[in-house]
Design a protein with these regions (language model features):
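Amphipathic alpha-helical "lid/sensor" segments that cap RecA-like P-loop NTPase cores
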Residues: 1-31, 111, 115
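C-terminal leucine-rich, beta-strand-based interaction scaffolds used for sensing/assembly
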Residues: 27-165
Length: 166
């Protein structure tokens, strides 16, 4: 993120353009998004050109996509972290859990919580996801899957055992 977004001439525009693209891909269940004034503002459209030049994105005609799916997942993780920081993660995910594209981002979010923020943060997210209605079980399952992929997964699973048997 630092190299491709933050340490550039247009960090805000590049970050916003990448986040908008990642969100639109997942929300619309598409791999490419048409670059137009409805989807991207003028600053974002300019930043998209720079992201294509830096090979983070690929352009075909009037559409853009991430060079690799992992870039999109990585940016969607950033979107989720931003929503969590503002206290709107559950609200943000409410209408989005029917899109499988968000699943990897939720799993990565769980992984991020376990590896960077600790078990308490993971437990808070797990509890908060209970408010997602019909999607609560799915969101919680994705967080649980993250625990199996973390460094020291046996230790993480042992620490999470009380939550798992509730």
């Amino acid at each position: 993120w630092d190299q491709q977004i933050e340490n550039t001439a247009q960090p805000l525009e590049r970050g916003s353009a990448a986040a908008t693209l990642a969100r639109l891909q997942a929300d619309r269940l598409v791999t490419e998004v048409r670059v137009d004034a409805e989807a991207f503002d003028a600053g974002e459209r300019s930043a998209l050109t720079a992201l294509v030049d830096d090979r983070l994105l690929t352009r075909r005609d009037d559409r853009v996509r991430f060079e690799h799916d992992l870039y999109g997942d990585w940016v969607r993780l950033r979107v989720l972290r931003s929503q969590a920081e503002s206290g709107r993660l559950v609200e943000f995910l409410e209408g989005r859990m029917d899109s499988p594209v968000w699943y990897r981002a939720v799993r990565l979010y769980g992984l991020h919580l376990l590896e960077h923020d600790g078990l308490a943060s993971w437990r808070e997210a797990f509890a908060a996801f209970g408010d997602l209605g019909d999607a609560a079980d799915l969101a919680r399952d994705l967080l649980l899957e993250a625990s199996a992929h973390t460094v020291g997964s046996a230790r993480a699973l042992s620490a999470l055992w009380p939550v798992l048997v509730e």
